[in-house]
Amino acid sequence: MRLALAESNDDRALREFYAESSLHGPVDLRVERPGNFFDQYRLQSDDYSTFLLKTDKDRVVGIATIIFRKAFLKDKFETIGYCTDLRIAPSRQAIMEWTDHFTPLLEQLTHEKGCHYFFSAIARNQGRAYNALVRPRSVRRHIPRYYQLGRFEIVSVLGRLPFAPPPLRTLVIRHADAAADFEALAAYLRKKTEGRLLAYEYSAEFLKRRLETWPGLTDRNFILAEDRRGNIVGCVAPWDSAAVQTFSVHQYNGFSKTLRNTMNLLALTRMTSRLPRTGQRLNFDYLTHFHADNPDIFYSLLYEAYEHARPNKFLVYSQFIVDPTTRPPKSFAAAKVPFSLYTVLSPKTPLPDFLRMPRVRAAPDFELALL
């Protein structure tokens, strides 16, 4: 087997291989790219590399992408690599070949890109990926080392209780205007992510670029919470990724079957949204750029986003365990899928200082829509 860099004319083969595999969990999902396969990566950066693992007969048996961007690491911004979309055919040979190719690849990219640190998110219920990558059986193999940076959950907000309290009356909640609000919004995002690992370099220009590169995202997507003095104290931007990536139900497993029946029954009372049948597409919004000064403001923004989305969609966001502000409020029905964010290091790379920091640290600046 050989590792090859994907090119634009590989788009069709990539989308076909990608659609054949499923993400395993409480609900097995099929992921499809309706447009160009690479559009998902351009949401985050124009600098990315997709690699194909091919057999001697040129059949694709594995893919993975590394996206490069500037991010904050302890005391400065530097280039990081985010490893995503790892798909390997379910054969021992393909898995072994991929892990053997991965370390030389990281060392090559470190030299070419000046990128010393790589990151990746893995679902904690994906046993095959966990055993192959995070907990390999042989410690003598020359493979990358995975160090847990933080644990988080993908929270799906499926419904709201009928007597849920309203948002705080002391807040002004409104939609943003790019010309009038993006400078103040960027300043707020910088304040909320200051000193946090993987933080972006927020500016008004950064936000405007996202409007240009995220299909369907406008300044009106941004919902601002302001105090009585007009200061921004929270924000969220619901966004539908269907133009670049869709998720459909391949199979419901275990408790998720009961959950679907319950949700669909409660949908008759308009307390929840209906969950789709097998083969149907999930209809949801990511809650992007989600920050709040306290849990009450977080609740108020979630309430407003839910009002805007219902009855056709549910809402999805990431909640890091160390961040109590973003825990799903009890007034909402929510399902959770556990994940971990890892730092991926070559065996030759020494342990960085940011991994030696106290175990309880602020949550990284992580945008679930870019997972």
Map each language-model feature to its residues.
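Non-catalytic interaction/regulatory modules that flank or connect domains
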Residues: 182-245, 307-312
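Contiguous mid-protein beta-loop-alpha structural module that forms a pocket-lining wall or clamp
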Residues: 92, 101-201, 212-214, 218
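Active-site/acyl-donor-binding loops of N-acyltransferases
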Residues: 121-169, 221, 234-371
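Conserved acetyl-CoA-binding loop-helix of GNAT-fold acetyltransferases
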Residues: 88, 93-108, 295-308
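Short amphipathic alpha-helix that is part of the acyltransferase structural core
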Residues: 1-52, 60, 82, 158-206, ...
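A short helix-loop-beta-strand connector motif used in the catalytic cores of GNAT acetyltransferases and
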Residues: 38-52, 62, 211-223, 243, ...
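Conserved beta-strand in the GNAT
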Residues: 59-69, 82, 230-240
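GNAT/GCN5-related N-acetyltransferase fold signature
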Residues: 53, 66-68, 88, 225, ...
